[in-house]
């Protein structure tokens, strides 16, 4: 599931606006360069030629992008509502449906070709996104060494008063041991009630065992 996108009703407006901006920026740049190149000689004429072509062609390009984005998001939201899930298949099917819908005025063959192109393009985009996500996850997970964390106030106390820092650490260990003792005291009677009196398991339960704090002390982590 994609958590960085808006919910479905708002997603249509968002994708339509983003597609319109992409068409405006990309179309303006492309048409300006095209008009600048095809204009007569002279810098001023070339600039005017590029600007005139931008004013004539960019609105239609931006509108086409907006229609494509709105249609794609509408089909995507319909698939999400029908399938009750969000995955790559929704995008692939939405791309195919969008291509077919926008080419419906040109006949069945044009619809099939546009649907195939949209399906292939969205499949490549989803595959590239999945590959990048897998590579990033592998890079982030490699070579990570987990170090024991310390409380922030311990580092501050060490710089101010080392003796107070050690006493604070001992107090924390004592509190931790006290909590463990309470847990053991409340847990052992409940366990022994379910075991028969003359049972080897009951004898083994009554034997002393090391607590978590004892194991930490034996490992000399502190």
From Swiss-Prot:
Fetch the Pfam families from UniProt.
Answer: Tim17
Question: Keywords on this record?
Answer: Membrane, Mitochondrion, Mitochondrion inner membrane, Protein transport, Translocation, Transmembrane, Transmembrane helix, Transport
TM annotation in the entry = 16-36, 60-80, 115-135
Claim: Transmembrane helix is one of the keywords in the record: yes
Q: Per UniProt, what is the membrane topology?
A: Multi-pass membrane protein
Asked whether the keyword Protein transport is assigned, the reply is yes
Output this protein's name.
Probable mitochondrial import inner membrane translocase subunit Tim17 3
Query: Coding gene?
Result: Tim17a1
